[in-house]
Amino acid sequence: MYKKILVALENGRADETLLPHISHLARLLGSELLLIHVADGWAARNFEQLGLAESEEMIGDRDYLESTAGTLRTGGLHVDVCLARGNPPDEILKTAEQYHCDLIAMTTHGHRLFGDLIHGSTITSVRHKSRIPILLVRAGVPSTPPS
């Protein structure tokens, strides 16, 4: 169970809450991790159609993924990375299926109706469409996984 976990990262502080939980779970279960970040800016969304080069933001996102993966690998975990481009919910679900992940891990920000209308909700879309279990960790809540 949970041989490959897709970990959706935001390249932000919320990841600091998620990663300790997921790395602990991966060690307990012997799971592989697939870190994904979905670049969704203009350049990312039009990358293929216009033959664009990676934007500064996309280069920074790739560096962040590789750095985070390196830290987790140093801790003894098997980690791959994926920088996707486009609509975050669609790319998360497509990548999870493509790589045969059996768990998706994400952070939730605890928005309510108004916040979701302004910010959108990747989680809402993913949880309604996913056929794979989802583990949600509340961002910004200081916690440590059990030892």
Residue ranges and their predicted role:
Residues 28, 37-63, 143-147:
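Acidic, proline/glycine-rich short linear motifs
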Residues 50-54, 98-100, 122-124:
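Short, hinge-like loop/turn segments at secondary-structure boundaries
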